[in-house]
Amino acid sequence: MALLQIAEPGQSAAPHQHRLAVGIDLGTTNSLVAAVRSGVTATLPDENGQHSLPSIVRYTQDGIEVGQVAALSSAQDPKNTIVSVKRFMGRSLTDIQSGEQAFPYQFEASENGLPLFVTPQGQVNPVQVSAEILRPLVERAEKTLGGELQGVVITVPAYFDDAQRQGTKDAASLLGVKVLRLLNEPTAAAIAYGLDSKQEGVIAIYDLGGGTFDISILRLNRGVFEVLATGGDSALGGDDFDHLLQAHMQQVWQLANIDSQLSRQLLIEARRVKEALTDASEVEASLTLADGTVLKQLVTKAEFDCLISALVKKTIASCRRTLRDAGVTADEVLETVMVGGSTRVPLVREQVEAFFGKAPLTSIDPDRVVAIGAAIQADILVGNKPESELLLLDVIPLSLGIETMGGLVEKVVSRNTTIPVARAQEFTTFKDGQTAMAFHVVQGERELVDDCRSLARFTLKGIPPLAAGAAHIRVTFQVDADGLLSVTAMEKSTGVQSSIQVKPSFGLSDTEIATMLKDSMKHAKEDISRRMLAEQQVEAARVLESLNAALAKDGDLLTSDERQQIDAVMAQLAEIARGDDADAIKQAIEVLDEHTQDFAAKRMDNSIRVAFKGQSIDNI
C-alpha cells in the first residue's frame, strides 16, 4: 500500500529537504559554478559539457554575448568585447588610464569617477558586466539542480578592498541572487582540499590566475583558518605570460604597428601556444594576416620559460616577503595549494616546489579548486550540514576596540573580519606606580569613544608598580563561531589577568549598523581632527605628569631662575592644552622639551654620580 505525504500548502513535506546553493568562482579569465550533490562536490558543466565560462562579455547592436561565443568574436570586435573585467572592479577611471597597459575600449567617467564602457548597448559599468558573467552561471545551476537557488557563495581575492567586494555583491544583487558570503579565494582552496579537518599547522595558498597573483599564509587551528599574512600582485597573472609571448611572436614575425583586431588575434594564438607548452617541449604558432598570408614559427618551452622567468621569480619574491610578514619559514609550511590555471605552467610548479621544499598539492584541477571550496561553504551556510560542522558563521559587522587615554578608540578587530577570530594588542600604563587599569570595550567605526557603542567594562588589578610605560598589558579579543566576544587583559611579567564576555551583535538591527557606518563616513574628516587634538592633549598631560614627578624628585638640581622658567613654560603648555588647536599644543610640547634639555642632562649626570659613589676604578 502506498503512503501519502501530507503537508500544509506551500510547505515541504520533507522537513530536512536539501536546500539549493552553489559556489561561484568569479574569475579574471574564466568563471565556474559548483555544487554539492549527494555528498559529492563538483563543478557544473553547460549543455556542451564545458565547465569553465570565459569571463568575456561582448555588446552588439543585437544584444549581449557571454562566454565562449563572445571569445570567438573578440579578435574581430575588441572594442566592444570586454575581457578581464575583474581588473576594473572598484578602480577609478583615472587609475585605469594611468596604468601601463592600453585598452581597446572607449571609456567615459561616471559622476563618481568610476569607468563606464561605451558600447552599442549604451554605457555599462564593471558591476553590470560582472552581472552578465554571473547570469549564465546562475541559470546553469538552477537548470542542473532543478530549482531556484537559495543563495550563493562568491569568491574574491584576499586583497580585494571594500569597494571591490561591494561591487561583487552588487553584481549578484542585479540578478536578484542572495549572496550568503564572499569567501576569500585562498580559504576556499584550503576547504576544497579538506585541510580544515586535517592536522594543525601552516598552509600556503599560491594563487596565480589570469590577472592576479595572490599568496596567502594561513594557520589552521582546530578547524579554523587564521590568515597570518597575504601578499601578491593585483596586476600579475597568466595574462602577462600571454602578453610577453605575444610580444615575442610579434617580434619574430617582424609585425609593426598592428591594429587592435590583429593584436587580439595574436594574443589568442599566444594563449593557445602557452597552454600547449604545458605538455609539449615545442609548439608551432601560426597567424593568418588579412591578405591571407599565413605566418608560422616554432616556440620552445625553453624560450617560453626564459620569457616568463622574471615574472615567476617575482611571485617567489612575494612568497618570501609574505612568509617574513607571517613570521614563519618555508620549512614550517605543511602544504602548498596551487590555485589558478596559470599554475599549470611547468616552470611555476618547479619554482614553487624548489622554494617550499616539497611538491605542491595539484590533485584538484587548479581552475576548479576555488569553486569547489565555495560550493562546500555554500552547502554549510544554507543549512545542509549539522551545526557542528559550521566553521564560518558570520562576519563582524562593526569594528571592536578599546578606549585609550583621551577618550580615543584603538580598533583591535576590524569590521567585516570573518569569525571565529582572535586579535591581540599591547598597551601600557600612563602613570608611575600604576597598579590597576580599567578597560572599556566599544564597538563602531568612529574615532572617539563618545561616538561608539559601549559593550563592557572591566578592571585588571595587580599590575607591578613600575614607571609609566614600563608595564606591558596584552589585550586579546576573541570572537567565537557564535559571535561571542571574550576580552582578556594580561600583565606579561606577572601573568595576572582579567577577562569579560559579551555578545557584540546583541540588540543591533541591520538598520542601526548601516546608520553607524554612514555616520562614520559622514564625520570622517571631523573625527580625524578631533582624534589628532585628543592625541596631542593626552601627550601634553603625559609630559606634564612626567615632568612634575621629575621636579619633585630632582628639582633641587635647578637654580631658582631655571625653575621659574620651566614652571612658566609648563603653565603655558597646560593653558594651550585646554584649547582646541592640535598644532599649537604640539608646538608648545616642543618648546617645553627645549627648555628642559639642560634639566634632563643634570638628572643624568646626577644619576651616574650616585651610582658610582663609593666605587673604585677597579670595581667599575
From Swiss-Prot:
GO biological-process terms attached to the record: iron-sulfur cluster assembly
GO molecular function list: ATP binding; ATP hydrolysis activity; ATP-dependent protein folding chaperone; unfolded protein binding
Sorted UniProt keywords: ATP-binding, Chaperone, Nucleotide-binding
UniProt xrefs under InterPro entries: ATPase_NBD, Heat_shock_70_CS, HSP70_C_sf, HSP70_peptide-bd_sf, Hsp_70_fam, ISC_FeS_clus_asmbl_HscA
UniProt xrefs under PROSITE patterns: HSP70_1 (PS00297), HSP70_2 (PS00329)
Record has Nucleotide-binding as a keyword: yes
Pfam families: HSP70
Recorded family membership: Belongs to the heat shock protein 70 family.
Known function: Chaperone involved in the maturation of iron-sulfur cluster-containing proteins. Has a low intrinsic ATPase activity which is markedly stimulated by HscB.
PANTHER family: HEAT SHOCK PROTEIN 70KDA
Name recorded for this polypeptide: Chaperone protein HscA homolog
